[in-house]
Amino acid sequence: KETATDYELDADIAYHDLQAKYIVSVPKHIAVKDKGGKVYRERSTQINGNGDITNITMHNGDKPSVYDMTYDAYGNLASLTKPENHKGQRMRYNYTYDDVLHTLVTSVKDAYGYTSSTVYDYKWAVPLETSDLNGNKMRYTYDGMGRPSTILAPKELESGRPYTLKFEYHPAERYAR
């Protein structure tokens, strides 16, 4: 319950039942109402057998907004399709993950074919280089403890500068105790 100035709202939440898999906290339906029963927000979800949300429907009057998701064999989000726009078109994003850890997003491709990508340092699971949909690159370096050392943005990369941001740590290469 949330109370604000002159009105009180209740959030009624129902959950999907996957107790056999110990999944008990995935919301199935939520409705936010005032004391008189007027609904201010309402959403519902559908899930797959793993408890992954495959569909979110936001009930906004007569035309609901629908999000659809798919997952890969590792349980990572493989695609996200957003609600229709005014022309009935839906934007879709496809996600690709690394072949080593199967957890780091290496590329995102949208419905227009635009792609952004990331190359990682697997020791720290941090980006070494990113490339946006326009081909602009950023590069990152890290110290021996996985902390950022330098960040090189597109403008400085193009002009041959050594960094855009540089970090120093004192004392260097030591863990806090």
Model-derived regions, located:
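Acidic, low-complexity segments
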Residues: K1-R177
